[in-house]
From Swiss-Prot:
Basic residues: bias regions: 62-73
Protein name: Large ribosomal subunit protein uL4
Name of the gene this protein is made from: rplD
Pfam families recorded: Ribosomal_L4
Functional description taken from the UniProt entry: One of the primary rRNA binding proteins, this protein initially binds near the 5'-end of the 23S rRNA. It is important during the early stages of 50S assembly. It makes multiple contacts with different domains of the 23S rRNA in the assembled 50S subunit and ribosome.
């Protein structure tokens, strides 16, 4: 594995130097099963789980026997709130539950590295100096810049939390999703056709990810002892 080099694009259509993408993050073997598990857990955690239905004992009414037991020629009934009646209770209906799944940090980190590596291998990661020049947000400028970078539809823009100008510039673009570097995740990377990093966001992400990798290696060595 060797580090990847990418040009840094500027808003005027030129390039300004290059950056290196560490092979330990952007050139690893992707595990489809692992990424699927992590994405499934992430989507499950977004579910509210507040669905609820009432059984026959919870539905209002139905305490009185609708008609006498014998002599009517009809089938005997004990309550008009039985499940087979309109307005009756639900049998085995959904109840509130927690859909979240436990996913270890190492699995999340490995899945994210695999997703980024896949995008890097297909030349779908881009690095920019700044999305919009100056301090005034401009949706038009942001859209033009992104269209020059890629013709694909779904774009994930990774920024620093302080870059409010860029975040406001892409807020109204329907197929562009902006995300702080510390919230980068497997689902958003895989959902996007292209991933665009600002230089500052890329540096922050690599620094955090490299620190996590060193901690994992240290823990592995200690466990081996």
């Amino acid at each position: 594995m060797s580090n990847l080099k990418l040009d840094v694009h500027t808003a005027d259509g030129k390039t300004n130097g290059s950056v290196e993408l560490p092979a330990s993050i952007f050139d690893v073997e992707a595990s489809v099963a692992l990424m699927h598990q992590v994405v499934t857990a992430q989507l499950a955690a977004k579910r509210q789980g507040t669905h609820a239905t009432k059984g026959r004992g919870e539905v209002r009414g139905g305490g009185r026997k609708p008609f006498r037991q014998k002599g009517t020629g009809r089938a005997r009934q004990g309550s008009i709130r039985a499940p087979h009646f309109t307005g009756g209770g639900t049998v085995h209906g959904p109840q509130p539950r927690d859909y979240s799944q436990r996913t270890p940090k190492k699995m999340k980190a490995a899945a994210l590295r695999g997703a980024l590596s896949d995008r890097a291998r297909h030349s779908r990661i881009h690095v920019i100096e700044e999305l919009v020049p100056g301090q005034i947000p401009s949706t038009k400028s942001a859209r033009s810049f992104l269209e020059r970078l890629t013709e694909r539809k779904q774009i994930l823009v990774v920024l620093t939390r302080e870059d409010l100008t860029a975040r406001k510039s892409v807020a109204n673009l329907p197929n562009v999703h902006a995300l702080p570097a510390d919230q980068l995740n497997t689902y958003d990377v895989l959902h996007a056709d292209d991933v665009v990093f600002s230089v500052e966001a890329l540096d922050a992400f690599i620094k955090a990810a490299s620190g996590a990798n060193k901690a994992e290696d240290q823990n592995t060595k200690e466990e081996a002892k």
